[in-house]
Swiss-Prot record:
Homology family: Belongs to the Gfa family.
PANTHER family from the UniProt entry: CENP-V_GFA DOMAIN-CONTAINING PROTEIN-RELATED, GFA DOMAIN-CONTAINING PROTEIN
Binding site for Zn(2+) 2: 48, 50, 53
Lineage, highest ranks first: Eukaryota, Fungi, Dikarya, Ascomycota, Pezizomycotina
Gene Ontology terms describing biological process: formaldehyde catabolic process
Name of the protein described by the UniProt record: Putative glutathione-dependent formaldehyde-activating enzyme
Organism (species): Verticillium alfalfae (strain VaMs.102 / ATCC MYA-4576 / FGSC 10136) (Verticillium wilt of alfalfa)
Its job: Catalyzes the condensation of formaldehyde and glutathione to S-hydroxymethylglutathione.
Comment on bound cofactor: Binds 2 Zn(2+) ions per subunit.
Catalytic activity: S-(hydroxymethyl)glutathione = glutathione + formaldehyde
Length: 187
């Protein structure tokens, strides 16, 4: 059984170019689109099943990655951006015209502060880092997906060469745990 994981995964995974230097993300508005320029490749690219990330219509997962804050610049129509949920840890800046999330930034003290979350599918350039894993897989159940088929979803990711996790991958979870431990030691 096959499920609509994400449009960019339909034909398998296209390898990125390790020397790729970035490009422009653009919202879906046909006139006056918001553009964001990334001056580096991304890291930790992954399929995300959480309920907060922007997903293309019909997709079960988003494809999201990070870039250093100083490598991201809103380059056109930034006045159309608004934070989706000001109480969230990741402040997702979405276009008020089309609803697409252009970037997410963490302002409070967090292991990932200094990294912006982005969706490279919003770019026409080729060479972005390919997805590395699938995270928050069981979160799609909370959004209405039939739990009886979650193992089929995991198998579909496995067929693409991606490990699936119910949180982030171990290196990212280790970073969060180390950050938490260091902060608790200071208290």
């Amino acid at each position: 059984m096959s499920f609509p994981l994400h449009p960019s995964l339909v034909n398998g995974i296209t390898k990125g170019n390790p020397s790729f230097q970035g490009g422009v993300l653009k919202c879906k508005c046909s006139t006056s689109p918001v553009t964001v320029t990334l001056r580096s490749n991304v890291a930790h690219n992954h399929a995300c099943g959480c309920s907060k990330c922007w997903k293309p219509e019909g997709a079960l997962f988003s494809i999201v990655s990070v870039v250093p804050v100083d490598k991201l610049e809103v380059t056109a129509n930034g006045d159309k951006l608004a934070v989706v949920d000001p109480s969230a840890t990741i402040l997702r800046h979405a276009c008020t015209g089309c609803g697409v999330h252009l970037y997410g930034r963490i302002e409070k003290d967090h292991a990932f502060k200094g990294l912006d979350f982005v969706h490279t599918e919003l770019s026409d350039e080729k060479g972005w880092q390919e997805p590395q894993f699938a995270g928050f897989v069981t979160s799609i159940i909370e959004q209405g997906f039939d739990a009886r088929h979650i193992d089929d979803v995991r198998a579909q990711f496995e067929s693409l060469g991606l490990e699936s996790y119910d949180a982030l991958n171990p290196p990212l979870m280790n970073a969060i745990a180390a950050f938490t431990a260091a902060n608790e030691a200071k208290a």
